[in-house]
Amino acid sequence: ASDVYKRQVSGDMIGYWKYYPVESENGVNWGKVPVWGMADIVESKCNGVEVGERIYGFLSMSSEVIMRPGKMKAASFVDMAEHRKPLPELYNGYSRTEGEPALYKTLENERCLLFPLFITGYVLADFLADNDYWGAEQVLIGSVSSKTGFGMAAFLNSETNFSGKLVGLTSPGNKAFVESLGDCQPTHKKIAPSN
């Protein structure tokens, strides 16, 4: 919910309204709020996209979405609508769910909630690794109990060659959860008073 709210509030600044724009009324521009979700193809005029297919991707919170599929692959396609071409392809790609592991079908809600933010954690960790951590001996992750935060910690801990100290910040209520993940250095009770 907080991620959806962020998109609503920052739609103009970050460009989220550009994915599913709406004609302006009286000089006021509008947009449909995008979310990561699942959709069923109910009509298709595109060879290779069949009615009844289920897809996963960055969708509009609306009853229907019109796309221009391109870059077709067995497991995916990209929405090639003209207004989306300058936008990051990560948000324009759609996975076809038909050939995916059966487990994915049972975890659709979790996939929509967790995958995008966990992937963001991977991208952040990979960015640090690609830049050799700018020589840092310590990485501090704010809100390490968030989906992006613990994803980043997990990837820094297991997928990169970071040999420094990994420190995560969290609230007292999330301390046990963060410690159970085992990706950060031991946490402390408090680093500053909360008042």
What are the residue ranges of the model-derived segments?
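Short, basic/aromatic beta-hairpin or loop at an interaction surface
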Residues: 21-39
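Short, small-residue-biased leader/transition segments that mark boundaries at the very start
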Residues: 1-5
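Non-transmembrane, aqueous-exposed alpha-helical and coiled segments at domain scale
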Residues: 191-195
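Mid-domain Rossmann-like dinucleotide-binding core that forms the NAD(H)/NADP(H) cofactor-binding site
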Residues: 103-190
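Short Gly/aromatic-enriched secondary-structure transition segments
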Residues: 6-19
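N-terminal basic, amphipathic alpha-helical segments
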Residues: 17, 25-29, 57, 61
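NAD(P)H dinucleotide-binding glycine-rich loop of Rossmann-like/cofactor-binding domains
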Residues: 58-137
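A glycine-/small-residue-rich N-terminal strand-loop-strand element
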Residues: 36-64
